[in-house]
A protein has these predicted regions:
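Nucleotide-sugar donor-binding catalytic core of glycosyltransferases
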Residues: 2-64, 72-83, 110-267, 271, ...
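Charged, glycine-enriched surface loops/patches
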Residues: 84-97
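Conserved acidic donor-binding segment of nucleotide-sugar-dependent glycosyltransferases
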Residues: 268-275, 284-289
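A charged, aromatic-enriched C-terminal amphipathic alpha-helix characteristic of glycosyltransferases
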Residues: 286-320
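A short, histidine- and acid-enriched strand-loop-helix "catalytic/donor-clamping" loop
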Residues: 95-108
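Short, acidic/turn-prone active-site loops that include or flank metal/cofactor-
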Residues: 99-101, 149-152, 275
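Short amphipathic alpha-helices within nucleic acid-binding modules
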Residues: 281
Length: 322
């Protein structure tokens, strides 16, 4: 490999470009290309597999001749793409990046026994939580690294139609165990009103795409933003929302989880444990405009400095001494 690797990302960055994670990933790679940290990058979009057949995405990866493949979706494990790639490109470095999280007892929705078959073809697995690093390493027989979500870097936007007192953007999933978040938000809403956007959820429907396009305006314009992941039990784990609520200029009222202040210290976000505490903090910042703006600015500055995808990719490259 030369000193400037060529990188392939496997994921929906073409199909769903407006996701803050996806736009942040492309932004980070383009910055690194401009700075000559990488020679080039390309995307193997999941739609190629869905549209053109089982092996189409493999051909895209192989024909691109990357030095490093980052599998960003679990389809790679379910479809055994790491094996097919390794057969054709024996010297390529392959990374499986798991930005999602499920508690151990869920066995990753029953896919675990299939996924671990790809372990022998992976050089590294990155996880967005610290609790499961040893478990994944043992069952996959691969090295693991903590590597959470990041955020896209862009200016704070404003649109008066989104100037809600308190907003939450995310799905309303009533199934167990995801309904714990629903219960928490409903409890807060009974104490102080919460505007819930995208209750129906989904990634590819037109309504969701419209929300993604306007997400910067939503977080930048709302006075306060509820920042709650589906799970808050794992050390270091938060969904992508945790990084781009602040990265897009929101005054984030965040559910506390283990390790949260290592990622965003108090003062860049406002943390709570109970619905009553969330209510108190929401009402305080609704009534203190200057303090609210300070949180927005500090949170964004912190996100841009420590949690951009340029930073994330440099962390990964450093792990491999690239």
């Amino acid at each position: 490999m030369n000193n400037k690797p060529k990188v392939c990302i496997v994921g929906n960055m073409i199909t769903l470009p407006y996701s803050p994670d996806h736009s942040g990933i492309i932004q980070g790679l383009q910055i690194l290309k401009d700075k000559e940290k990488i020679s080039d990058y390309f995307i193997a979009d999941i739609s190629q597999h869905q549209t053109y057949g089982e092996r189409a995405i493999i051909e895209t990866i192989v024909n691109g001749k990357p030095d490093l493949v980052i599998h960003g979706m679990t389809d790679s494990l379910s479809q055994e793409w790491p094996r097919f790639v390794k057969e054709r490109l024996p010297n390529v470095i392959q990374v499986m990046s798991m930005w999602d999280y499920r508690p151990d007892y869920m066995n990753y929705d029953g896919f675990w026994s299939k996924w671990i078959e790809s372990g022998r073809y992976l050089d590294l697995i990155t996880l967005s939580n610290k609790n499961q690093l040893k478990w994944w390493a043992k069952d996959f027989g691969a090295k693991t690294m903590y590597w959470p979500h990041g955020c896209v870097v862009k200016s704070i936007e404003y649109d008066s139609q989104y100037e809600f007192d308190t907003v939450f953007v995310g799905s309303r999933n009533e199934s167990t165990p995801y309904n714990e978040r629903v219960k928490l938000i409903d409890a807060i809403d009974r104490l102080t009103p919460v505007k819930w956007v995208n209750e129906g959820g989904g990634d590819s429907n037109s309504a969701r795409i419209g929300i993604w396009k306007d997400l910067g305006k939503i977080y930048g314009s709302a006075k306060t933003t509820l920042d709650i992941s589906h799970f808050w039990d794992a050390d270091g784990y938060a969904s992508g929302r945790y990084f781009y609520t602040s990265g897009l200029g929101g005054c984030a009222i965040a559910k506390r989880f283990p390790g949260c202040e290592e990622l965003f210290p108090e003062g860049t976000k406002i943390y709570f444990d109970t619905p009553e505490e969330a209510m108190d903090k929401i009402k305080y910042y609704l009534n203190h405009n200057d303090e609210r703006e300070k949180i927005k600015i500090k949170g964004k500055e912190w996100a841009n400095k420590y949690h951009s995808y340029e930073v994330r990719f440099l962390e990964l490259f450093n792990w491999f001494n690239l």
